[in-house]
């Protein structure tokens, strides 16, 4: 006879979870001193704790309401005639020609690199676009998606998704990881589920996890964060607490960035006490993880427009709300190119920090360093797509960061860690030579980025923007079966990040066995 059922346990925990207000820190119980133990012999209470969590998320996966899992009804009306084209570049000025033509026709540029430009447009606009392009570009494009509406529909969670659909296109090693992984990461999750999950993590792992908020969005939503570490268990600290900040979801449609933040948070949380490397890194640093800094836009991308990019703040043009959060920071802000066009996907606002969410994150970071006894030594801003690791500066290639050599060394180390984990290749370059700069050359501002602000204004020694999977086959509509593999490779990169920033004292930390696999829940 079973003493507990998953439903009974879940119902017992619901008051506990609901009692934790979103955006507030959770007071931990008396300090716990973690011990190291093996995967095969977990502590009894840890085993029960993990079983409870696994049971809860099994229930959520099977009984998730249609409100969260059903795609918006207007997908085919909005995107039924849209396609995504990739233009292959042969000459440097071709990217500028494409961007200029896209601005004239109000098209959505998905990606600009030194090799290609991806553009979304209605199929009946293709002749108009080609007429504005040089002859060399008129025959140098290929379709990436010829039925965008169906691709968008497929990106939403489905309660009837078959195992064969889920497993298509993945290597056997990746499938093995997914089969052992928490079901929470087998689908993209709406904000309401993510917030409840964060509260549960803080409640169940209170020795080293707290839930907090970095501010409130324009529409009044909390911007929740998880703070991982053991500093709250220490009565005295010597100097500011070293902190690593990881942010996702600046652009609402980049769902993989939000899911990756939750995956690496869960990996750090559950490896604590099991892995000596993770345990030491959580003793040395506070890790602050924000799944989405743009909750309003993220919710809107679930409920109304899957490809929404900006926040939901009103602008001077009522029909074109939203400011690009990654163009709104007050270091080398350059919003003149988009000031007169609030409809632009890159609209930077009428002045620096007009985007409320960017302002809130900056205020939180400044308060942490000025009053909270913290030193933000690392900043990782996760985006998609194109598989790039970018370091400062983004606003200009004529300005060289004073710590360029260290920035390059660590960036190459992150790329190597990813390659060793999944065999995926991430390009390493200055942001001014990557996607951001190509956009700037084409008249799209690249100033006002979070990457540059943290590095220059807050003196964060290691500041990066990481463009996650893939290289364009799916673009912003990366299938959910890539959540786990992407999370694994970024988790390994984060451990490499923490070890490098720590320096010589961490030279004895071994990451060889850190594959990014989840600690089993049963």
From Swiss-Prot:
Known function: Inactive carboxypeptidase that may play a role in cell wall organization and biogenesis.
GO terms, molecular function: zinc ion binding
Cofactor note: Binds 1 zinc ion per subunit.
Family per record: Belongs to the peptidase M14 family.
Compartments in which it is found: Vacuole; Secreted
Entry keyword set: Cell wall biogenesis/degradation, Disulfide bond, Glycoprotein, Metal-binding, Secreted, Signal, Vacuole, Zinc
One GO CC annotation: extracellular region
Single GO BP term: proteolysis
InterPro entries: Peptidase_M14 (IPR000834)
Pfam families given in the database record: Peptidase_M14
Disulfides per UniProt: 320-343
Signal peptide: 1-19
Gene3D superfamilies listed in its UniProt record: Zn peptidases (3.40.630.10)
Keyword Secreted on entry: yes
Protein name: Inactive metallocarboxypeptidase ecm14
Cofactor: Zn(2+)
Binding-site residues for Zn(2+), renumbered to this chain: 251, 254, 383
SMART domains assigned: Zn_pept
Propeptide: 20-159
PANTHER family recorded: INACTIVE METALLOCARBOXYPEPTIDASE ECM14, PROTEASE FAMILY M14 CARBOXYPEPTIDASE A,B
Entry keyword annotation includes Iron-sulfur: no
Domain Peptidase M14: 187-501
Residues annotated to bind substrate: 251-254, 309, 326-327, 384-385
């Amino acid at each position: 006879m079973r003493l507990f059922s998953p439903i009974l346990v879940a119902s017992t925990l619901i008051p506990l979870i609901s009692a934790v207000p979103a955006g507030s820190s959770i007071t931990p119980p008396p300090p716990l001193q973690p011990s190291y133990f093996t995967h095969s012999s977990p502590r009894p209470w840890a085993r029960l704790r993990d079983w409870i969590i696994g049971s809860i998320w099994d229930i959520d996966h099977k009984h998730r309401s249609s409100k969260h899992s059903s795609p918006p009804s207007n997908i085919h009306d909005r995107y039924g005639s849209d396609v995504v084209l990739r233009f292959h570049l042969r000459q440097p000025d071709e990217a500028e020609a494409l961007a200029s033509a896209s601005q004239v026709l109000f098209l959505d540029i998905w990606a600009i690199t030194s090799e290609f430009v991806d553009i979304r447009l209605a199929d009946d606009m293709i002749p108009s676009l080609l007429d504005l392009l040089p002859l060399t570009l008129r025959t140098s494009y290929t379709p990436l998606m010829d039925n965008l509406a169906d691709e968008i529909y497929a990106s939403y969670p489905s309660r009837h998704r078959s195992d064969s659909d889920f497993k298509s296109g993945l290597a056997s090693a990746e499938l093995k990881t997914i089969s052992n992984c928490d079901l929470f990461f087998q689908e993209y999750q709406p904000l309401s589920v993510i917030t409840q999950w964060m509260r549960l993590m803080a409640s169940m792992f209170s020795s080293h996890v707290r839930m907090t908020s970095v501010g409130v969005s324009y529409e009044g939503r909390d911007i929740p964060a998880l703070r991982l570490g053991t500093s709250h268990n220490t009565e005295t600290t010597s100097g500011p607490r070293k902190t690593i900040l990881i942010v996702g979801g600046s652009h609402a449609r980049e769902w993989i960035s939000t899911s990756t933040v939750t995956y690496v948070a869960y990996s750090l949380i559950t490896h604590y006490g099991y892995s000596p490397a993770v345990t030491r890194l959580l003793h040395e640093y506070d890790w602050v993880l924000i799944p989405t800094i743009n909750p309003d836009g993220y919710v809107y991308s679930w409920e109304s427009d899957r490809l929404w990019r900006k926040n939901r703040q009103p602008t001077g043009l009522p029909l074109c709300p939203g400011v690009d959060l990654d163009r709104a920071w007050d270091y080398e802000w350059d919003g003149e190119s988009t000031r007169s066009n609030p409809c632009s996907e890159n609209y930077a606002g009428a002045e620096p920090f007009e985007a409320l969410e960017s302002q809130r994150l900056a205020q939180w970071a400044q308060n942490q360093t000025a009053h909270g006894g913290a030193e933000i030594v690392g900043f990782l801003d996760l985006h998609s797509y194109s598989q790039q690791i970018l370091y400062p500066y983004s606003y200009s290639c004529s300005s060289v960061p004073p710590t360029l050599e260290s920035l390059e060394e660590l960036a190459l180390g992150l790329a190597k860690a990813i390659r060793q984990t999944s065999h995926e290749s991430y390009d390493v370059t200055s942001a001014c030579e990557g996607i951001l700069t190509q956009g700037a050359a084409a008249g799209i501002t690249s100033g006002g980025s979070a990457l540059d602000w943290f590095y220059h204004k807050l003196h964060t020694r290691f500041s990066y923007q990481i463009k996650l999977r893939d290289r364009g086959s799916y673009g912003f509509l990366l299938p959910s079966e890539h959540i786990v593999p992407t999370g694994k490779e970024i988790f390994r990169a984060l451990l490499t990040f923490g070890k490098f920033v720590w320096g010589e004292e961490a030279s004895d930390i071994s990451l060889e066995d850190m594959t990014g696999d989840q600690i089993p829940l049963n």
